[in-house]
Amino acid sequence: MNDDLYHERLVALARAADNAGVVSPPALSGEADNPLCGDRVRMTLRVKDGRIAALAHKTRGCLLCEAAAAAIGRRAPGSGIEDVHSIAARLRDWLKNGTDLPAGTWPELADFAPVRAVKSRHDCVLLPFDALIQALKEVDPR
Amino acid sequence: MSFDVASLRAQFPILSERPGGRPIHYLDNAATAQTPQSVIDTVSRHEATSRGNIFRGIHRLAEMATEAYQNARGDVARYLGVADPDEIVFTGGTTAGINLLAHAYGDTLNHGDEILLSDLEHHSNIVPWQMLRERSGIVLRWLPVTDEGRLDLDALARQIGPRTRLIALSHVSNVTGAETDVGRVVEAARPVGARVMLDGAQRAPHGPLDLPALGVDFYVFSGHKVYGPNGIGALWGRREWLEALPPFLGGGHMIHRVARERSSYADIPHRFEAGTMPIAQAVGMAAALRWSMALDWKEATAHTQRLTERLLHGIASIDGTRIVGPLGLQGRIGVVSFDMPGLHPHDICQILDGHGVALRGGHHCCQILMDRFDLAGTTRASIAPYNDDADIDACIDGLKDAVRRLR
């Protein structure tokens, strides 16, 4: 199980740390904490015409959390807010409820497949998405 | 004669399990220690032959259960080195014991009275006092921590004053493994009339205590860390102090008489044991303490110290790794925390799990201490007498593998 979890693509994704940093103001921001481990992700972004125009993340977390934040950093800029909400919900279902990951979601997400078998680590992957949704609440308070 | 760790290990059935097809290298003893067959048998036998509610039943099983429960109180007293079993209050564990004190002792305090804590306390010895502060306006003061992860007792004189009513500290840190010099704390407390409470969760598993010699006023610990069941622990307090405290939880058994206008309360320890207590767990914890009292702790300590040294050397041999706590063996137990830059504790623990090694990663419920060392968390290995060289070596091999795979 552990041999699968930290496979090469996932480690590379975490180390790539796409769009790590902070978007200069004016920006929306959202933060998510995992009280079990103290990990924290802060997302800052700008939205224009219903799409994410710019995004950056500051991530203090494990490799799974860093990889998920990097996937967001790589794919969220340019995405529509609706799509981001949908991807976050589908990822959560895929991890926790064993549903399929539909075609058309961000390709990096499939690299998290081994995490599905390790329940204690699901929230590590979801933490950056929680921060992203938190940031989007300012423009889309669902 | 050398310490016979093989025969000790044989007493712990879980250590011969092979979850995932691998041997268990259990180094998460500071979170929960494993339990010997004698304790499992005692709890099972109690439930099979003596199960009943205690104190008020007029039948044979109730009498047997009451006797077992009260005998358990006597065993706890013996383990702590105190003569009066009525000074032992059964609790749900260390956290429950501290919360009991924060309410009962807290009710005797006035606005502006001070309680001294430290930056290395477990959240269970911080949050109950913060909640008391919100209820009653007491003031919390804080002892700092040295770079070596010890309490900075040189700061005692600055932090203790005429309003100090209680000093509540860990006997041993659950992160750094450092043991508190209790004598210095008691010596500083006495001139101002402050009481001293020790959180013994990490010290109690490492052999019987002599609380009168320590000179403290209250002591708390947990059953599951002393090789016993979950859901049980004990608070010890000096009789004169316990008798002066109001009850915390109200309910059955803790009363003397109940009337519409008011109720009066039972004598100690019953005043603090409302409702039906965890009876089988108390009996099991007492069995664990009897098991511990039968162990040669001089040899066991020499053994765990040797393993601690092996662990410290092994960790130090990994490039860039930093021990968060004392580097030597003096004044510490085998609780060893460390930081491996660039590697997250949960990733390390996950990799080590693949080697059959159980470690703990995270803030260890000590976020103030983590802030002190500018860390989000550490990885922790903690040693019990049933650990052996193979456990330590598997841990070091696993850590080297984690570095290879994650860095």
Regions found by a protein language model. Give the residues of each.
Chain A
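Short capping/connector residues at structural and topological boundaries
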Residues: 28, 41, 57, 69, ...
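C-terminal binding/interaction regions
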Residues: 1-21, 79-142
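Functionally engaged cysteine thiol sites
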Residues: 37, 62, 124
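Alpha-helical support elements that line or immediately flank enzyme active sites
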Residues: 68-80
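Short, thiol/selenol-centered motifs that function as redox-active sites or metal-ligating centers
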Residues: 59-66
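Structured beta-strand/loop patches that form or line metal/cofactor-binding pockets in enzymes
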Residues: 16-59
